[in-house]
């Protein structure tokens, strides 16, 4: 079981709702993933009209928890305003907070992120901040009141997997009581498994599933990858070594020489 603020879930895979070939495929992929939490962009819903209504109907049919996001926001003011609109529209105090600082890498503006998180938490929000793997930034977010922190593995949509494993491991070691979710940059189920093997509580992704040749099958693959990674972490992974260590004993009499 896993807790996000006061909500308990069983799935450690969170997925986005954008970029799918069709709404029907999106719905089937979410079901196949087993995800209980999906991210939704306010900008998509705010467009309104029949398209927005149809999308919202599909989401409601899935019986999942919606995590609105502030995707595309590039200032503290814009992110805070978007979060407040999302709370009104979706009826939730949850917000996946994004404050983008660079258009090419979509790297978070971590200074603005901490400022926006502080403002929103004081206003009663439960913030899921998208950040880099920087320990100081994560610590500042926790000090501001975030009980969930979501560092990236790599730039959004890059599919590179975990670039700075040591930094992510340090975050896990230093923030043992915080729910940590690897968010962005995962491209393969093995990447998700690796994040869970590090002790991360969950992963959030979108493009790797939505842009796969078969999004539904890929969603199922990520579900299995997450389950495998968590099981491996709980089982206790052996430590890596610099030198070989024989797995077969070489001391004693060979079995074919033993006297019965």
From Swiss-Prot:
Which HAMAP family does this UniProt record tie to the protein?
ThiG (MF_00443)
Its domain of life reads: Bacteria
Q: What functional role does this protein have?
A: Catalyzes the rearrangement of 1-deoxy-D-xylulose 5-phosphate (DXP) to produce the thiazole phosphate moiety of thiamine. Sulfur is provided by the thiocarboxylate moiety of the carrier protein ThiS. In vitro, sulfur can be provided by H(2)S.
Which PANTHER family is this protein grouped with?
THIAZOLE SYNTHASE
Q: By what name is this protein known?
A: Thiazole synthase
Q: Catalytic site residues?
A: 96
Q: InterPro entries per the record?
A: Aldolase_TIM, Thiazole_synthase_ThiG, ThiG
Annotated gene: thiG
- What GO terms describe the biological role, i.e. biological process, of this protein? thiamine diphosphate biosynthetic process
CDD domains per the UniProt record, alphabetical? ThiG
What reaction does this enzyme carry out catalytically? Answer: [ThiS sulfur-carrier protein]-C-terminal-Gly-aminoethanethioate + 2-iminoacetate + 1-deoxy-D-xylulose 5-phosphate = [ThiS sulfur-carrier protein]-C-terminal Gly-Gly + 2-[(2R,5Z)-2-carboxy-4-methylthiazol-5(2H)-ylidene]ethyl phosphate + 2 H2O + H(+)
Q: How does it assemble?
A: Homotetramer. Forms heterodimers with either ThiH or ThiS.
Q: What is its EC number?
A: 2.8.1.10
What's the family?
Belongs to the ThiG family.
Q: Name one GO cellular component term.
A: cytoplasm
Keywords in alphabetical order? Cytoplasm, Schiff base, Thiamine biosynthesis, Transferase
Question: What GO molecular functions are on record for this protein?
Answer: thiazole synthase activity
The uppermost taxa in this organism's lineage are: Bacteria, Pseudomonadati, Pseudomonadota, Alphaproteobacteria, Hyphomicrobiales
Record-linked Pfam families: ThiG (PF05690)
Residues that coordinate or bind 1-deoxy-D-xylulose 5-phosphate: 157, 184-185, 206-207
Q: What class of enzyme is it?
A: transferase
Location of the protein in the cell? Cytoplasm
Pathway in which the depicted protein is active: Cofactor biosynthesis; thiamine diphosphate biosynthesis
């Amino acid at each position: 079981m896993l807790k996000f603020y006061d909500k308990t879930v069983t799935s450690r895979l969170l997925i986005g709702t954008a970029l799918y070939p069709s709404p029907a495929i999106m719905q089937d992929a979410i079901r196949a993933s087993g995800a209980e939490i999906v991210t939704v962009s306010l900008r998509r819903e705010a467009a309104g009209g029949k398209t927005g209504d149809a999308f919202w109907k599909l989401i409601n049919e899935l019986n999942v928890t919606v995590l609105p996001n502030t995707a595309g926001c590039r200032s503290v003011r814009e992110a805070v305003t978007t979060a407040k609109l999302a709370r009104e529209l979706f009826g939730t105090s949850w917000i996946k907070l994004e404050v983008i600082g660079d258009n090419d890498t979509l790297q978070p503006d971590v200074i603005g992120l901490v400022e926006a998180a502080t403002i929103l938490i004081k206003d009663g929000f439960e913030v899921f901040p998208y950040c880099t793997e920087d320990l100081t930034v994560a610590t500042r977010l926790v000090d501001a009141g975030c009980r969930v922190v979501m560092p990236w593995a790599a730039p959004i949509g890059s599919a590179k997997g975990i670039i700075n494993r040591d930094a992510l491991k340090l975050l896990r070691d230093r923030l043992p009581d915080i729910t940590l979710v690897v968010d962005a940059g995962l491209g393969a189920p093995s990447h998700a498994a690796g994040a869970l093997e590090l002790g991360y509580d969950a992963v959030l992704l979108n493009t790797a599933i939505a842009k796969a040749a078969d999004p539904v099958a890929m969603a199922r693959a990520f579900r299995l990858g997450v389950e495998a990674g968590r099981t491996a972490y709980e089982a206790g992974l052996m430590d890596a070594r610099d030198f070989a260590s024989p797995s077969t004993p070489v001391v004693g009499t060979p079995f074919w020489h033993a006297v019965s």
